[in-house]
């Protein structure tokens, strides 16, 4: 196949949702239906030996939440699907944001009982800012849930886009009878069962078929009235509007019962776009170009604790990747020849010989690659859009056993480069390392990982700081003067970018007034010392 044909087969998407909407379950079931796994690990059965394929880190298995993004590749209907499962917990929104820069579409999972929740809205704003097409799956229809028309209205008002139902529920909760496929004019009957595939599903054709009315009575009467209303009032599906992020196709189902999953998988193949062009600072990079380019959007330490390794997750932007090819790291101008490159089914790795635009490949390395790095066959390119946000919570960290100080620094350096936490080193000698986070759970996860992956018992101590701003100035003397005058508040992050740490916004306002030549930034690009203040 040509590069163009290979690119046309690719679909790369992320699954996003509020915590507990059933995202990890749906991820499992998509893998099951595509034939990538034989048995889905129930996320609820955490104490059993079976765990969700996409929740592989020890703390995820214990707590039943996704805290690191997982990457999985599978083939379905002659398409290569790259599925990125993201953390649902709000404390990990930065990691989710980084994943959303690497995909061409998003699958939004909504809990039918709760509707559109705050975390979903934040993630959707990121998708909207990038014009990422969104497919919506309304989950848990076999529970007591809200009215479907109400849910549609909520999606439209919160997301600012038209919701176009492709299927519609007949009943809900205990009286959930199935979903009616509006486009194919047939009803798929619901039968509970977690290990069931769709091979033996029962269908009844035709909205006006008396058989359906006979079997489902009042529930179908209500559903058919709603479907008629939708056919008259809702806009028709427009593929161009979907690709522009102005329409979202909506599906209903119950992921835990494998119901409605097939339709979503088919929609991903039929509707989601193939990889598109990506804008670098220097030029537009097209996926069908013969030369390889790729961007590191995630670094994960200790995917294999036995080897203490770090894997850089690279989204291929153009060309064809071949194992052993010579690549240039644009940030350092250094050359590398990765030989043991892998593709993923969560933590299960397979050696990879080639990859094309849209694919996500893993390059094991020992700190050579950082978040935001661009890999090319020689060209100097810079991609932006992979930010660190200024943390809002701070804790000092100390090691209980002074003999483990080196391991603490190694662990925090790796976790900081991975983006799991922000690590600040005080300018004043002898000060404790400071950790910065956007949510409290990040500290717990880091303490747990330091213990299990690096053998370090760390103490987290309260900090007087509540705010950080990276500092720059076009006048080096003005910057030095500011740093000398505020030495006790200056610290350096993992790329040695200087930051000003303070306890209140009032302190920031005073500093801005006293030092007009110094700029205070709420955001830093992962690619290095590139700063900004907004998304």
From Swiss-Prot:
Disulfide bonds: none annotated. Keywords: Cytoplasm, GTP-binding, Nucleotide-binding, Protein biosynthesis. One of its GO terms (cellular component) is cytosol. InterPro entries: EF-G-like_DII, EFG_III/V, G_TR_CS, P-loop_NTPase, PrfC, RF3_C, RF3_dom_3_sf, RF3_GTP-bd. Coiled coil: none annotated. It comes from the Bacteria. CDD domains: RF3 (cd04169). Its main location: cytoplasm. It is found in: Cytoplasm. Signal peptide: none annotated. GO terms for molecular function: GTP binding; GTPase activity; translation release factor activity, codon nonspecific; translation release factor activity, codon specific. Residues 8-276 form the tr-type G domain. GTP binds at residues 17-24, 85-89, 139-142. Belongs to the TRAFAC class translation factor GTPase superfamily. Classic translation factor GTPase family. PrfC subfamily. NCBIfam families: prfC, PRK00741.1, small_GTP. Increases the formation of ribosomal termination complexes and stimulates activities of RF-1 and RF-2. It binds guanine nucleotides and has strong preference for UGA stop codons. It may interact directly with the ribosome. The stimulation of RF-1 and RF-2 is significantly reduced by GTP and GDP, but not by GMP. This is Peptide chain release factor 3. It comes from Bordetella avium (strain 197N).
């Amino acid at each position: 196949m040509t590069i163009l044909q290979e690119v046309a087969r690719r679909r790369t998407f992320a699954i996003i949702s509020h915590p507990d909407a059933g995202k990890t379950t749906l991820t499992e079931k998509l893998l099951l239906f595509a034939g990538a796994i034989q048995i889905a690990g129930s996320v609820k059965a955490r104490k059993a030996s079976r765990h969700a394929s996409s929740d592989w880190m020890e703390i995820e298995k214990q707590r039943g939440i996704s805290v690191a993004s997982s990457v999985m590749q599978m083939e379905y209907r002659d398409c290569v699907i790259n599925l990125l499962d993201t953390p649902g917990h709000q404390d990990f929104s930065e990691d989710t944001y980084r994943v959303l820069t690497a995909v061409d579409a998003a699958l939004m999972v909504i809990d039918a009982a709760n509707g559109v929740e705050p975390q979903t809205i934040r993630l959707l704003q990121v998708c909207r800012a990038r014009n990422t097409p969104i497919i919506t799956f309304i989950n848990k229809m076999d529970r007591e849930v809200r009215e479907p028309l109400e849910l549609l209205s909520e999606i439209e008002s919160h997301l600012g886009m038209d919701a176009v139902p492709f299927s519609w529920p007949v009943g809900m909760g205990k009286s959930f009878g199935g979903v009616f496929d509006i486009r194919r004019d047939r009803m798929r009957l619901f039968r509970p069962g977690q290990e069931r595939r769709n091979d033996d599903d029962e269908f009844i054709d035709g909205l006006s078929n008396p058989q359906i009315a006979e079997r489902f009575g009042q529930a179908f009467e209500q559903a058919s009235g709603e479907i008629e209303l939708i056919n008259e009032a809702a806009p028709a599906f427009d593929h161009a509007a979907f690709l522009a992020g102005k329409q979202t196709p909506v599906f209903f189902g119950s992921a835990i019962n494998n119901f409605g999953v097939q339709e979503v998988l088919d929609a991903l193949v039929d509707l989601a776009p193939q990889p598109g062009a990506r804008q670098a600072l220097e030029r537009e990079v097209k996926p069908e170009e013969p030369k390889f380019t790729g961007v590191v959007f995630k670094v994960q330490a200790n995917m294999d604790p036995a080897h203490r390794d770090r894997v850089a997750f690279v989204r291929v932007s153009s060309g064809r990747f071949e194992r052993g090819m010579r690549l240039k790291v644009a940030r350092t101008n250094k050359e590398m020849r990765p030989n043991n490159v892998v593709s993923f089914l969560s933590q299960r790795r397979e050696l990879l010989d080639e990859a094309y635009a849209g694919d996500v490949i893993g390059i094991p390395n020992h700190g050579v690659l950082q978040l935001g790095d661009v890999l090319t066959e020689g060209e100097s390119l810079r991609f932006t859009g992979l930010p660190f946000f200024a943390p809002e919570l701070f804790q000092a960290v100390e090691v209980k056993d002074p003999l483990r100080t080196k391991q603490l620094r190694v662990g925090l350096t790796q976790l900081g480069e991975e983006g799991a936490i922000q690590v600040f080193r005080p300018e004043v000698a002898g000060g404790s390392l400071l950790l910065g986070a956007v949510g409290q759970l990040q500290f717990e996860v880091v303490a747990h990982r330091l213990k299990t992956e690096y053998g370090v018992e760390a103490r987290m101590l309260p900090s007087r700081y509540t705010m950080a701003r990276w500092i720059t100035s076009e006048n080096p003397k003005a910057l030095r003067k500011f740093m000398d005058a505020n030495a006790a508040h200056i610290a350096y992050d993992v790329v040695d970018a200087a930051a000003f740490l303070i306890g209140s916004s009032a302190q920031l306002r005073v500093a801005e007034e006293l030092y007009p030549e110094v700029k205070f930034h709420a955001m830093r690009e992962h690619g290095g010392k590139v700063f900004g203040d907004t998304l």
